[in-house]
Amino acid sequence: MEKRMKELVDKLNQYAKEYYTEDNPSVSDAEYDKLYRELVTLEAEHPELVQADSPTHRVGGLVLDGFEKYQHEYPLYSLQDAFSREELDAFDKRIKSEFPNADYMAELKIDGLSISLTYVDGILQVGATRGDGSVGENITENVKRISDIPLKLDQPLNITVRGECYLPRAEFERINTQRQENGEAEFANPRNAAAGTLRQLDTKVVAERRLATFFYQEAGPTERLTQNDVLNEVAELGFSVNPRRIVTSSMDEIWDFIQAVGQDRDHLAYDIDGVVIKVNSLAMQEELGFTVKAPRWAIAYKFPAEEKEAKLLSVDWQVGRTGVVTPTANLTPVQLAGTTVSRATLHNVDYITEKDIRIGDTVIVYKAGDIIPAVLRVVESKRTTQEAMPVPSQCPSCGSGLLHFEDEVALRCINPSCPAQIKEGLIHFASRDAMNISGMGPSVVEKLFKAELVKEVADIYGLNSQDFLQLEGFKEKSAEKLYAAIQASKENSAEKLLYGLGIRHVGAKVSKQLLESFGTIKELASADVQAIAAVDGLGEVIAKSIQRYFAKEEAQVLLKELESYGVNLSYLGQKVTDDAILSGKTVVLTGKLEHLKRSEAKAKLEALGAKVTGSVSKKTDLVVAGSDAGSKLEKAQSLGIEVKDEAWLLDL
């Protein structure tokens, strides 16, 4: 019986690969269904013999409690964007200055969601979202329901692959037609539908929506020599790989490829938002390295934004967490880049004045970066009104007088008790990059604020699960889950809290730099401007902003309240001191490490005071080389740079 079940699993997986990945089925649907039903029957009779890669796992049926966080072993980076031929030429010039013979691979930029799949001994173990690039969500049960993802590889490999999950246009239309018939809200575009589907707790819904994938990367060390080799290998392993790509050293040929793709864009079976250009040689990629956010060896050309005419009906003025008042246009609905748009940003009051935008105007609307709808300009030939846009003099939230500082383009409310600012501040405090309180999004904050359960961030920690049961949509389990998330956030390292406080000019990166230096928020709060400005050369603008914030009595009271609730005010990483063993040193990691994950090695080096970079240069002080180290090691040796091994790092 076990032999027959294995035979059925192998056959059905092969047939599924032919159908979904290769688009070349060798059996009829009826034959497939017959074998599938036989397998379902046998698995029901012998549940102890069900295989990990059985296609029956794709059907759904599980209802998940939620998604666990997942730490990526290798970060998922963003890409540098380009919007013109000139920017591509500048990229080409930079690459060719170091590697005159470099060639590139250009491929389609699928408009979907990044996913990472990890296989152990050839069996799918983890499927995860990109998240912030370092930490995503474990969505393994959902990716198992995507038909073109192999549950088992033909070889017993330990491998992590990255790709894009998307919803085909035909499937998007089918789902929206069905939702319309059911009286449900339609999805705005295929990307939103794919995102909502991947985060579904009901796996049956995921199986029904027929998501698809294209894979483009193997994470970590590989024996392949080029990006194109990687794609060929990934395809051979059974993953879907987009066939439309070119390899060339000529930016002229890449530009021709981009133009051809742009002409075909509307006729593809899926949405794309550009073309990705990568240095083809993996050795060159390694030597070029990364910036904080993106690889230096790749760039994403974004197609020019689609533009449409719409009538400007009215303007809403909205208050952000820093008091900036932003105008948003209400428009006659238009279809724009696959989305129905009826609202668009007008940026700020100076933009309205500069463009002479008026109520009743016909305006050109586009999507900035293919994401945010914005008003570009007025079609003056269609103007019917002579009245200038009315600009508010009072805050639409609290009624306080608005100020327009000479050095700012926006109106600003400076009332610290403004309800809109407080609500936006609470949303920011709970956000992923700040205190990361899962489940406390804008709608929940709105409900808490309306019920007068929170008026400032410290109030969040005075809530209990019973408080949430007062709110619409909460049941015992969801209330307990949110309460647990709040309690867990107390243990965050203090840079998360510092960022969450919303101090002007203090982002997530600056928060970490400050806490690495001062160790605790209390130490930072009592520091003078000179001491703060000296941290990594942050400067006086940031330093004065921090000092002004902590000089306020309400900020001092807030810190005491947070501490009384047990919120951690200390940096949990290792404080970097001037006498740290690697203080001021620039270090490069290369090769395969046997005992440490690359992220762990990087964290240890940074804790010892090092600045870890992705490429070797004359400014590099030290290279830590693992096995199979390539061109970076060779370059370090040619420059006479000190080289250490992993054992040295472990002993520190």
Swiss-Prot record:
Gene Ontology annotations of biological process type: DNA repair; DNA replication
Annotated EC: 6.5.1.2
PROSITE patterns linked to this entry: BRCT (PS50172), DNA_LIGASE_N1 (PS01055), DNA_LIGASE_N2 (PS01056)
Keywords: DNA damage, DNA repair, DNA replication, Ligase, Magnesium, Manganese, Metal-binding, NAD, Zinc
Disulphides: none
Obligatory cofactor(s): Mg(2+); Mn(2+)
Catalysed reaction equations from the record: NAD(+) + (deoxyribonucleotide)n-3'-hydroxyl + 5'-phospho-(deoxyribonucleotide)m = (deoxyribonucleotide)n+m + AMP + beta-nicotinamide D-nucleotide
EC top class named in words: ligase
Ligand binding (Zn(2+)): 395, 398, 413, 418
Spans through the membrane: none
Binding site for NAD(+): 29-33, 78-79, 107, 130, 164, 278, 302
InterPro entries linked: BRCT_dom, BRCT_dom_sf, DisA/LigA_HHH, DNA_ligase, DNA_ligase_AS, DNA_ligase_CS, DNAligase_adenylation, DNAligase_N
Family: Belongs to the NAD-dependent DNA ligase family. LigA subfamily.
Official protein name in the record: DNA ligase
Organism the protein comes from: Streptococcus thermophilus (strain ATCC BAA-491 / LMD-9)
